[in-house]
């Protein structure tokens, strides 16, 4: 596979291999059959990052081969959204003859949405001044004149110049509802929108008929919390990153949801609060013991759940666990499987044509 060419004819084969691999990994835990969720075979990534290579008067996107480390010119990137692919050549055509905008430009990041909005971040190894801002504003206006709903951001060491705003609003159809999600530049968002929709609908189905309240750790911009709010009396969610918390609060209001409470703290801090180890000013006015959380939702980093959080998670009757790294999921399952059993197992093909697997498990207390 090269960045400019996807082996779409082998999509089914690579998905079957992942299903088999996940089944083998989950066999020791008595897991049920894998429920696979397919990705679009192309244009599935809503974000992309490229280094920029300068070659005389020319400049172009590049990526590096993972094995040989050789640079590869990328004029089109079929893994990325059609919106990103439409913009890529037009953006470079505008940058090439512009010395102010191209000088020491080393990277371009794209974040697009199904709703047609896009953020472009230009990264530099130099100080950005008023001349850069004026040139960037002219570029933004020209691209908007060509029909792009674009936000343009400049970044350099300890500098961020935001011409208008650093966010876009995504709209996802989830189980018959149009869910609005504000996505902030340089913050985590699910890269594959089609798979994200399927993950949300799977999580909704897995928790249908659930009793009591939901606790979510690592909630980000509220991606899962807000969709799952319809299945629970109340939702209590934690997130440590300030931009994500602000986006989550906006998303709560935009979706007119009134039963979700976001707390800005880490999973480790929340564990300490629940155990009474520490008191936190951020929890003033929030009675943790008023929540009857029978279900906990976790979508941890690649490293999985730490030991203390793992012990806390075991205290809940139902555990919904989304993992971007089945190896650390299996490590966690050696502990969780002692108190809970896996009743549902899903494979989400978030990253087609790579060895990466995203999966979900529902565990119920034995």
From Swiss-Prot:
One of its GO terms (cellular component) is cytosol. The keyword tRNA processing applies. PROSITE patterns: SAM_MT_RNA_M5U, TRMA_1, TRMA_2. CDD domains: AdoMet_MTases (cd02440). Keywords: Methyltransferase, S-adenosyl-L-methionine, Transferase, tRNA processing. The active site is at 324 (nucleophile), 358 (proton acceptor). GO terms for molecular function: rRNA binding; tRNA (uracil(54)-C5)-methyltransferase activity, S-adenosyl methionine-dependent; tRNA binding. Gene3D superfamilies: 2.40.50.1070, Vaccinia Virus protein VP39 (3.40.50.150). InterPro entries: MeTrfase_TrmA_AS (IPR030390), MeTrfase_TrmA_CS (IPR030391), SAM-dependent_MTases_sf (IPR029063), TrmA_MeTrfase (IPR011869), U5_MeTrfase_fam (IPR010280). It catalyses: uridine(54) in tRNA + S-adenosyl-L-methionine = 5-methyluridine(54) in tRNA + S-adenosyl-L-homocysteine + H(+); uridine(341) in tmRNA + S-adenosyl-L-methionine = 5-methyluridine(341) in tmRNA + S-adenosyl-L-homocysteine + H(+). One of its GO terms (biological process) is tRNA methylation. The keyword Methyltransferase applies. S-adenosyl-L-methionine binds at residues 190, 218, 223, 239, 299. Its EC number is 2.1.1.-, 2.1.1.35. Belongs to the class I-like SAM-binding methyltransferase superfamily. RNA M5U methyltransferase family. TrmA subfamily. Dual-specificity methyltransferase that catalyzes the formation of 5-methyluridine at position 54 (m5U54) in all tRNAs, and that of position 341 (m5U341) in tmRNA (transfer-mRNA). This is tRNA/tmRNA (uracil-C(5))-methyltransferase. It comes from Edwardsiella ictaluri (strain 93-146). The lineage of its organism: Bacteria, Pseudomonadati, Pseudomonadota, Gammaproteobacteria, Enterobacterales.
């Amino acid at each position: 596979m090269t960045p400019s060419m996807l082996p779409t004819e082998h999509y089914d084969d690579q998905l079957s291999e992942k299903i088999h691999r996940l089944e083998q990994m989950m066999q020791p835990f008595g897991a049920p059959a894998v429920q696979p969720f397919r990705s679009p075979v192309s244009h599935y990534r809503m974000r992309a990052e490229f280094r920029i290579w300068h070659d005389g008067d020319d400049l172009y996107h590049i990526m590096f081969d993972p094995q040989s480390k050789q640079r590869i010119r990328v004029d089109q990137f079929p893994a990325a959204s059609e919106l990103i692919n439409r913009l890529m050549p037009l953006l470079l055509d505008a940058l090439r003859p512009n010395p102010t905008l191209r000088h020491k430009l080393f990277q371009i990041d794209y974040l697009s949405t199904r709703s047609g909005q896009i953020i472009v971040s230009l990264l530099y190894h130099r100080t950005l001044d008023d001349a850069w801002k004026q040139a960037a504003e002219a570029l933004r206006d020209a691209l908007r004149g060509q029909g792009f709903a674009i936000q343009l951001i400049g970044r350099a060491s300890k500098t961020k110049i935001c011409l208008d705003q650093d966010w876009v609003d995504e709209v996802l159809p989830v189980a018959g509802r149009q869910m609005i999600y504000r996505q902030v530049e340089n913050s985590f968002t699910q890269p594959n929108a089609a798979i994200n929709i399927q993950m949300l609908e799977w999580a909704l189905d897995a928790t249908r008929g659930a009793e009591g309240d939901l606790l979510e750790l690592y909630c980000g911009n509220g991606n899962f919390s807000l969709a799952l709010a319809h299945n629970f009396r109340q939702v209590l969610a934690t997130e440590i990153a300030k931009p994500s918390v602000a986006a989550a609060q906006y998303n709560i209001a935009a979706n007119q949801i009134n039963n979700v409470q976001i707390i800005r703290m880490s999973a480790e801090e929340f564990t300490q609060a629940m155990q009474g180890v520490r008191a936190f000013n951020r929890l003033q006015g929030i009675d943790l013991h008023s929540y009857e959380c029978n279900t906990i939702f976790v979508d941890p980093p690649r490293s999985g759940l730490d030991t203390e959080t793992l012990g806390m998670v075991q205290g809940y009757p139902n555990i919904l666990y989304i993992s971007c790294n089945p190896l650390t999921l299996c490590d966690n399952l050696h502990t969780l499987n002692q108190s809970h059993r896996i009743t549902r197992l899903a494979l989400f093909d978030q990253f087609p044509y790579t060895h990466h697997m995203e999966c979900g498990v529902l565990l119920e207390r034995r």
